[in-house]
From Swiss-Prot:
Annotated gene: rps27ae
KW Zinc (keyword) present: yes
GO terms for cellular component: ribonucleoprotein complex; ribosome
Pfam families: Ribosomal_S27
Protein known as: Small ribosomal subunit protein eS31
Transmembrane segments: none
Family: Belongs to the eukaryotic ribosomal protein eS31 family.
Organism, as annotated: Methanosarcina acetivorans (strain ATCC 35395 / DSM 2834 / JCM 12185 / C2A)
The protein's assembly and partners: Part of the 30S ribosomal subunit.
Note describing how the cofactor binds: Binds 1 zinc ion per subunit.
Cofactor dependency: Zn(2+)
Taxonomy, superkingdom: Archaea
Length: 49
């Protein structure tokens, strides 16, 4: 998946479609799995409810 797919542009505004990793900071996105969000860089995982 290309980085351009992580953002959505509507008119003059840009919105992020994926969350940043809270450990790694801005620029490192969390992968969206069926039951969790995971960082491929540091291994951080958040389970969905």
């Amino acid at each position: 998946m290309a980085v351009k797919d992580y953002y959505k542009v509507q008119g003059d505004s840009v919105t992020r479609l994926k969350q940043f990793c809270p450990r790694c900071g801005p620029g490192v996105f969390l992968a969206d799995h069926k039951n969790r969000l995971a960082c491929g860089k540091c291994g951080y995982t958040e389970f969905k409810k």
